[in-house]
């Protein structure tokens, strides 16, 4: 029976690849169904012989308890956005300062959810959401129900790949029809539907909704020397890669492609929101490197956002965690990019003056970055009142005088005891990119603050399970989960805490970079400004902000209290050791290693202070080679780069 089951699995997986990946099926649907039913019968009779790559894994229902957090071995960066031809020209100019004759590759920007797939010895072991780029959620069981994701690869590879999971428009229409018939609210757009589906705890629901994927990158160090070759390699492994792409030598060719895609956009079977432009050569990518937040070798051109007219009804003014007072417009409801919009940001007081926005104006509304509703401009021909908007002079939260500094565009409350600032700081501290305390969202924080149970972030760690039961709507099970989530967050690596403190100019990526160098928040608090400013990608503004923060008595007390409650202040990731053997060197691994796994070799190099990259460039300092090193060894020799073997690495 085992032989027949092997034959059926191999056949069915081949036919599935032909159907979903190649769009060239060699058998009829009825023949596929017949073979599938035969396999199901055999697996029912011999459950102990079910194979790991059996296609039946995709349809079985399983109710999950939840999604565990998963640390990405290779971080997922955001891309810099571009909204005009001029911004693309500026990107090209920056690239050409480092790379003389770049070739670009242009790919469609799929409007879906970023995913990371990890295979060990060719078997899918982890499917993870993007999350904050460093930590995502393990949704492996759900992604196994996406029919075009291979459960096994044709080679026994250890590899991590990146892509987008999306809902095709046809599937979206079918899902919404079913929801309508069942009296359920319809999804606003395919992206929301895909997101909601991947968050399902019942995997059978995922299997029914016909999600799909496009893969676009090998995240683990690539064995190919260009993005285009990497995409072709992904296709060879059985992944679906979007065929709509071009290689371009200049911005004129890129702009023509963007215009062509823009005209075809509405006729595609899936949603896109732009075009991603990357430097094709991976060695050139290594030369260009990264900013703190994004690669310097790529940009995402976003199509112009949909615009609608709405009438301004009133303006609300709210205080953020840094004291900035932000105006929000209340509008007559309009449908915009698949959702109903009745509120939109007015950015700041200077923006209101610049756009001359007045009471009862008709305004143009759009979604900035296809996400945040914003007022773009006034329709002056429809103006009905000359009366200017009322600009507040006192903080809407604490009634302190508001200040408008000469070098700032916004009004600001500088009262350190302002309730709104404290509460927003607590919300930020618990948020996903900071301490990531599951369940401790704005509504719970507001209730805790109103009940005087928390006044600063250290108070969060003094809460007991019974404290949550004092809050309206919180039951015993929820209270237990909240308490457990708070306790679990104590073990976070310290960059999460540093970002959570809300220090001005210190975002999540900067926090990680700082802790890689200083290893703990206590060390960082003692560092001088010159030492901080000398770190690559940082500078004087960040250094001064840190110095100002840590110089206050309040910060010293807060860190002491956090430590006393058991919150970790140390960095748990790979640190940069200033005096390590390979400190500051850029190293490439190539060829087949005999004794070390590639991941082990990479970890060892990084522990010795090296930066491990996938491509050889003029910035490469050292190449560690195994058997069958091939073209990378040849290129290293041509460039005069130092070459070492596995035995040398083991001896360090």
Curated annotation (Swiss-Prot):
Active site (record annotation): 109 (n6-amp-lysine intermediate)
Catalytic activity line of the entry: NAD(+) + (deoxyribonucleotide)n-3'-hydroxyl + 5'-phospho-(deoxyribonucleotide)m = (deoxyribonucleotide)n+m + AMP + beta-nicotinamide D-nucleotide
UniProt KW Hydrolase keyword: no
Enzymatic class: ligase
Keywords, ordered alphabetically: DNA damage, DNA repair, DNA replication, Ligase, Magnesium, Manganese, Metal-binding, NAD, Zinc
UniProt cross-references to HAMAP family, sorted A to Z: DNA_ligase_A
Molecular function in Gene Ontology: DNA binding; DNA ligase (NAD+) activity; metal ion binding
Protein name from the UniProt record: DNA ligase
Originating organism: Streptococcus pneumoniae (strain CGSP14)
Annotated residues for binding of Zn(2+): 395, 398, 413, 418
Gene that produces this protein: ligA
């Amino acid at each position: 029976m085992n032989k027949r089951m092997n034959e059926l699995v191999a056949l069915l997986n081949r036919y599935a690849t032909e159907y979903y990946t190649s769009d060239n099926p060699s058998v009829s649907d009825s023949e596929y169904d017949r073979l599938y039913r035969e396999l199901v019968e055999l697996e029912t009779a011999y459950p102990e012989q079910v194979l790991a790559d059996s296609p039946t894994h995709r349809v079985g229902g399983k109710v999950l308890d939840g999604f565990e957090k998963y640390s990405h071995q290779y971080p997922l960066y955001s891309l810099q956005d571009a909204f005009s031809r001029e911004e693309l020209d500026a990107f090209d100019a920056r690239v050409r300062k480092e790379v003389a004759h770049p070739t670009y590759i242009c790919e469609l920007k799929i409007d879906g959810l970023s995913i990371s797939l990890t295979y060990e010895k060719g078997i899918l072991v982890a499917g993870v959401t993007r999350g904050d780029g460093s930590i995502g959620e393990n949704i492996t069981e759900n992604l196994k129900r996406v029919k075009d994701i291979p459960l096994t690869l044709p080679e026994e590879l250890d590899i991590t790949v990146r892509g987008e999971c999306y809902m095709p428009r046809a599937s979206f229409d079918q899902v919404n029809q079913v929801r309508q018939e069942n009296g359920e609210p319809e999804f606003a757009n395919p992206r929301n539907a895909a997101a909601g589906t991947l968050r399902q705890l019942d995997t059978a629901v995922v299997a029914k909704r016909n999600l799909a994927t496009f893969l676009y990158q090998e995240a683990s160090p690539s064995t190919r020397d260009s993005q285009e070759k990497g995409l072709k390699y992904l296709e060879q492994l059985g992944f679906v890669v979007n065929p709509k792409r071009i290689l371009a030598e200049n911005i004129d060719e890129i702009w023509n492609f963007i215009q062509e895609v823009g005209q075809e956009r509405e006729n595609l079977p899936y949603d896109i929101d732009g075009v991603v432009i990357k430097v094709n050569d991976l060695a050139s990518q290594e030369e260009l490197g990264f900013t703190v937040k994004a690669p310097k070798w790529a940009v995402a051109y976003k199509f112009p956002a949909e615009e609608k007219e709405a009438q301004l009804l009133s303006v609300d003014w709210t205080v953020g965690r840094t004291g900035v007072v932000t105006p929000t417009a209340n509008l007559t409801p309009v449908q915009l990019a698949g959702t109903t919009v009745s509120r939109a940001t007015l950015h700041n007081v200077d923006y209101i003056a610049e756009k001359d926005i007045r009471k009862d104006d008709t305004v143009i509304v759009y979604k900035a970055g296809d996400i945040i509703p914003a007022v773009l401009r006034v329709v002056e021909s429809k103006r009905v009142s000359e009366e200017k908007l009322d600009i507040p002079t006192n903080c809407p939260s604490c009634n302190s005088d508001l200040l408008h500094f000469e070098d700032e565009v916004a009004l600001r409350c500088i009262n350190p005891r302002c309730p709104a600032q404290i509460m927003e700081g607590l919300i930020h501290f618990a948020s996903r990119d900071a301490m990531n305390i599951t369940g401790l969202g704005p509504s719970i924080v507001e209730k805790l603050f109103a009940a005087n149970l928390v006044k600063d972030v250290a108070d969060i760690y003094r809460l007991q399970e019974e404290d949550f039961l004092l809050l309206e709507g919180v039951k015993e099970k929820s209270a237990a989960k909240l308490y457990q989530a708070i306790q679990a967050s104590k073990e976070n690596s310290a960059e999460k805490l540093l970002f959570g403190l809300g220090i001005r100019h210190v975002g999540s990526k900067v926090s990680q970079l700082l802790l890689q160098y200083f290893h703990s928040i206590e060390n960082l608090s003692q560092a001088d400004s010159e030492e901080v400013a000398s770190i690559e990608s940082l500078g004087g503004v960040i250094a001064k902000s840190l110095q100002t923060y840590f110089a206050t008595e309040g910060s010293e007390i807060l860190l002491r209290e956090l430590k006393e409650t058991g919150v970790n202040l140390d960095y748990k990731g790979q640190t940069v050791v200033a005096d390590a053997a390979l400190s500051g060197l850029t190293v490439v691994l190539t060829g087949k290693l005999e004794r070390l796994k590639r991941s082990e070799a990479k970890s060892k190099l990084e522990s010795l202070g090296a930066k491990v990259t996938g491509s050889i460039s003029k910035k490469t300092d050292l190449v560690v080679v195994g058997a069958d090193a091939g073209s990378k060894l040849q290129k290293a020799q041509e460039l005069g780069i130092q070459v070492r073997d596995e035995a040398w690495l083991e001896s360090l």
